[in-house]
């Protein structure tokens, strides 16, 4: 479902189409001297705005998809880490090595001394801080799992018969975690850039769709009059500026 803010951007573009339709209906009377207010320019701006809205929607869908993929990729991590630790515990690893492994496993489980279980935050957040914390959580999980692999690789008797516990399988799983995390980071950047581009087209000072729409209204008011039927047709068409 689209967020309220995304609906607001799309509504601005839809209302701009309505504004153009009224201006077109005024015929030759609508003939502003300013190029940016002329019908050809308005139609170009409308088409560009439509493209920007579509680009943001596509980028968001991609971001949502790879975010879900990452969550699925990381789901087996905790149980796998437990299996690794349990197998390691029955090897001839030193007490220190087992203690180090326990520390890493606790981090992967989200456990810390004196604290409750702490999982990566949900991906629904929209603030930069929420995204940053989430990214750090997944980065940390990936790094700790890599450390786990390094640790068990140093133990000669770590030779499990279970395929999923072999160093080869663990390394492949670690690579899949890295890939899933990188895909989210790249999609996040693309989504952010798409929003920046859209906001520039819709809300840039003087040249953005909202400011241009305001100027169109002023022009119609000037040529037809504040109490004219023509101005009343468009004066109520609402355009909402971006909240800073």
Task: Give the positions of each predicted feature.
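Basic/polar low-complexity intrinsically disordered segments
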Residues: 1-244
């Amino acid at each position: 479902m689209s967020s309220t803010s995304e609906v607001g951007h799309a509504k601005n573009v839809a209302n701009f189409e309505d504004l153009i339709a009224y201006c077109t209906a005024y015929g030759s009377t609508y003939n502003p001297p300013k190029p940016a207010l002329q019908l050809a320019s308005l139609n170009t701006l409308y088409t560009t705005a439509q493209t920007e809205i579509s680009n943001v929607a596509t980028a968001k869908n991609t971001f949502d998809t790879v975010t879900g993929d990452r969550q699925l990729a990381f789901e087996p991590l905790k149980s796998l880490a437990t299996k690794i630790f349990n197998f390691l515990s029955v090897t001839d690893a030193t007490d220190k090595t087992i203690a180090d492994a326990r520390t890493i496993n606790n981090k992967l489980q989200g456990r810390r001394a004196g604290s409750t279980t702490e999982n990566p935050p949900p991906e629904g957040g929209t603030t930069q801080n929420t995204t940053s914390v989430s990214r750090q959580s997944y980065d940390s999980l990936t790094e700790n799992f890599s450390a786990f692999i390094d640790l068990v690789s140093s133990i000669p008797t770590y030779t499990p018969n279970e395929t999923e516990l072999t160093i080869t399988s663990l390394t492949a799983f670690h690579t899949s975690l890295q890939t899933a995390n990188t895909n989210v980071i790249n999609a996040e950047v693309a989504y952010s850039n798409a929003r920046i581009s859209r906001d520039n087209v819709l809300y840039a000072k003087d040249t953005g769709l909202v400011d241009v729409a305001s100027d169109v209204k002023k022009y119609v008011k000037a040529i037809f009059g504040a109490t004219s039927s023509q101005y009343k047709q468009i004066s109520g068409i609402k355009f909402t500026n971006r909240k800073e």
